[in-house]
């Protein structure tokens, strides 16, 4: 039996070993399909990252699909039931690295757009595609660079669906209408190394830091709001000492991360952390990594169109959530437009035996097409 268009394209993309930041020809496949629809293509290669911006139309509003062709490494091959880059159908599922994150979404976007344009060749507004090979990596030369390029020429996306795997049980049961911000601090508290038998000749930075670290860990940063939970402070890494049991360390390294809501901003977090550390009279060095601001699409035409599209396919409305990690939506939101995430079930993403339900690919395509119809028909 011949594969459906979305299944065939998903298989083609999975078969290309596009481990971040490699694209492995995935974007060439997508570009060929979009050029046939009359899209203008702009390839943007920054350092080791392949990106493209495609647009059909010149009028407002500008609606865009966004996604990534790169995938995480497959891991230990012996743990896979089937080769990760040989797409395999089994009991109604399609297995392969990237099936859910997010080559299935990319295929659904392309096929939905083909169907929409076939029915509405003179559609309203404009359709765009913002695609990168650097979402799973350091996110330095990917979507953020494309966004900066577009903003510099005042070409701003009004509405965007990011194809991240947002769903939990069935496709479309969750739409992410926002994400928390993320900021990481790398703290080094400086003491004086010495022998544990002579503590008066040393200055233990671990002991000096504990009260400050406890204060940060127990701080109520905010109460959250109707869209976001309270800000979370977590310590993923600590390091001190030489490994010897008789040496007081000279330095204590603590890495912490805050996932924060729209109730906070980077500047306020830095200010409060610095105040806490200074109150405990520490000699320290603190470096910050800004991973992204929170964003929220609480109302608007895009959200209405997506909710209606999901409801038309599933006969039930999706939950609107802001949970989970960061995504490239945080960069696109800088343009000031509406951004949501809608994609496959995320139960197997980044795992061995990653898979997507084949029927879900068809449903996701229908949801994307219906969204286009709601906005631009």
Swiss-Prot record:
Residues that, per the record, bind Zn(2+) 1: 68, 101, 164
Co-factor binding comment: Binds 2 Zn(2+) or Co(2+) ions per subunit.
One function term, GO molecular function aspect: cobalt ion binding
Biological-process GO terms, alphabetical: diaminopimelate biosynthetic process; L-arginine biosynthetic process; lysine biosynthetic process via diaminopimelate
EC category: hydrolase
Catalytic residues identified in the record: 70, 135
Protein's UniProt keywords contain Amino-acid biosynthesis: yes
Stretches that traverse the bilayer: none
InterPro entries: ArgE/DapE_CS, Bact_exopeptidase_dim_dom, DapE_proteobac, Peptidase_M20, Peptidase_M20_dimer, Peptidase_M20A
Domain of life of the source: Bacteria
EC number per UniProt: 3.5.1.18
Binding residues for Zn(2+) 2: 101, 136, 350
UniProt entry tagged with the keyword Membrane: no
Catalytic activity: N-succinyl-(2S,6S)-2,6-diaminopimelate + H2O = (2S,6S)-2,6-diaminopimelate + succinate
UniProt keyword list: Amino-acid biosynthesis, Cobalt, Diaminopimelate biosynthesis, Hydrolase, Lysine biosynthesis, Metal-binding, Zinc
A Pfam match: Peptidase_M20
Pathway terms, separated by semicolons: Amino-acid biosynthesis; L-lysine biosynthesis via DAP pathway; LL-2,6-diaminopimelate from (S)-tetrahydrodipicolinate (succinylase route): step 3/3
Cofactor needs: Zn(2+); Co(2+)
Family: Belongs to the peptidase M20A family. DapE subfamily.
Biological role stated in the UniProt entry: Catalyzes the hydrolysis of N-succinyl-L,L-diaminopimelic acid (SDAP), forming succinate and LL-2,6-diaminopimelate (DAP), an intermediate involved in the bacterial biosynthesis of lysine and meso-diaminopimelic acid, an essential component of bacterial cell walls.
Assembly, per entry: Homodimer.
Protein name: Succinyl-diaminopimelate desuccinylase
Organism: Vibrio vulnificus (strain YJ016)
